[in-house]
Amino acid sequence: MRKFPLFSSSLSFLLLILFKENDIIVVMEKKKLRINMLSSSEKVAGQGVSGAYRELVRLLHRAAKDQLIVTENLPIEADVTHFHTIDFPYYLSTFQKKRSGRKIGYVHFLPATLEGSLKIPFFLKGIVKRYVFSFYNRMEHLVVVNPMFIEDLVAAGIPREKVTYIPNFVNKEKWHPLPQEEVVRLRTDLGLSDNQFIVVGAGQVQKRKGIDDFIRLAEELPQITFIWAGGFSFGGMTDGYEHYKTIMENPPKNLIFPGIVSPERMRELYALADLFLLPSYNELFPMTILEAASCEAPIMLRDLDLYKVILEGNYRATAGREEMKEAILEYQANPAVLKDLKEKAKNISREYSEEHLLQIWLDFYEKQAALGRK
């Protein structure tokens, strides 16, 4: 047998010797890539960034352990450092000389999207805008969860080739329909009959989410039960905090505000929904839509340009509160027509499944790590 020279233990691959007839096939097994995640998103409950972050990390730990070593918030060398939030210490770390590999920034929001979400003093708005774009410019590549962000980033001076769109996704083992007998029990627990029509919404309680329209619909349709899951993730900084806090403490009798709930309770609320309604005026890439779709809840949304791109008609589009009201009454009178929306929800779930997105992320990290080695 031919003898091979000894290889140093520091070599970045193994030689696997396979024999096929008289030929020797040498297959080089690449080393695992080290991806270091930097995120403070889970310090704030009840907002989508933390959910998207945890879904990605969980998926990579479970399904990519043969290709990646994933760490979180460690001061270590890595092939790729993935910044999920724009904390100031993270910003400062981009100036350090230690090898952090390729710096990837996750764009969950732009300065303009903070309008209607947080109360930012007028004199600070310019500073916040400059900081956000300065952070993004420190990155070697950006990932957007909202394809509509790309043009805004380009307008801010970031090269188009430095931006990649990769959507959010959800775990079907976590977000799934419940058995009918469980739904009946949940309705009984809430004192609701089997034929009581229920509209569920979810998200932070803030103006841009269209919460005012949700409340008005409850007032105008007292025969319908409305449930909005979510609260003030950013406390008093939330735009309209005092106004909405007062309403939540004294809502219409047919409107339930359970507050920020656990994923298990949220899954139950999706199961209760005859219709999931998100009346947002401005959205990033709402995890609640993907969660509701994975639970096979029929979905109705305000007719935003973003949804036309990412959801491709797999929902009921409405121009405003009056159309929402007409649609709710239509579905209440004829629940059978909701079957079509249920099928469309399944289409959304298939498009944004873990299986579909896993390979996209693996290919992306591989490409970025290779660029970082050049």
From Swiss-Prot:
Chief localization: membrane
GO molecular function: hexosyltransferase activity
InterPro entries: Glyco_trans_1 (IPR001296), Glyco_trans_4-like_N (IPR028098)
Regulation: Activated by the negatively charged lipid phosphatidylglycerol (PG).
Keywords from the named record: Antibiotic resistance, Carbohydrate metabolism, Cell membrane, Glycerol metabolism, Glycosyltransferase, Lipid biosynthesis, Lipid metabolism, Magnesium, Membrane, Transferase
Catalytic activity field: a 1,2-diacyl-3-O-(alpha-D-glucopyranosyl)-sn-glycerol + UDP-alpha-D-galactose = a 1,2-diacyl-3-O-[alpha-D-galactopyranosyl-(1->2)-alpha-D-glucopyranosyl]-sn-glycerol + UDP + H(+)
Cofactor field: Mg(2+)
Gene3D superfamilies named in the record: Glycogen Phosphorylase B (3.40.50.2000)
A GO cellular-component term linked to this record: plasma membrane
GO biological process, one term: response to antibiotic
Enzyme class: transferase
Pfam families linked to this entry: Glyco_transf_4, Glycos_transf_1
Location of the protein in the cell: Cell membrane
Domain of life from the UniProt record: Bacteria
EC number assigned by the record: 2.4.1.-
Family (UniProt): Belongs to the glycosyltransferase group 1 family. Glycosyltransferase 4 subfamily.
Function: Galactosyltransferase involved in the biosynthesis of the bilayer-forming membrane lipid alpha-galactosyl-glucosyldiacylglycerol which is involved in maintaining constant nonbilayer/bilayer conditions (curvature packing stress). Also involved in the beta-lactam resistance. Catalyzes the transfer of a galactosyl residue from UDP-Gal to alpha-glucosyl-DAG (1,2-diacyl-3-O-(alpha-D-glucopyranosyl)-sn-glycerol) acceptor to form the corresponding galactosyl-glycosyl-DAG product (3-O-alpha-(D-galactopyranosyl-alpha-(1->2)-D-glucopyranosyl)-1,2-diacyl-sn-glycerol).
Protein name: Alpha-galactosylglucosyldiacylglycerol synthase
Organism of origin: Streptococcus pneumoniae (strain ATCC BAA-255 / R6)
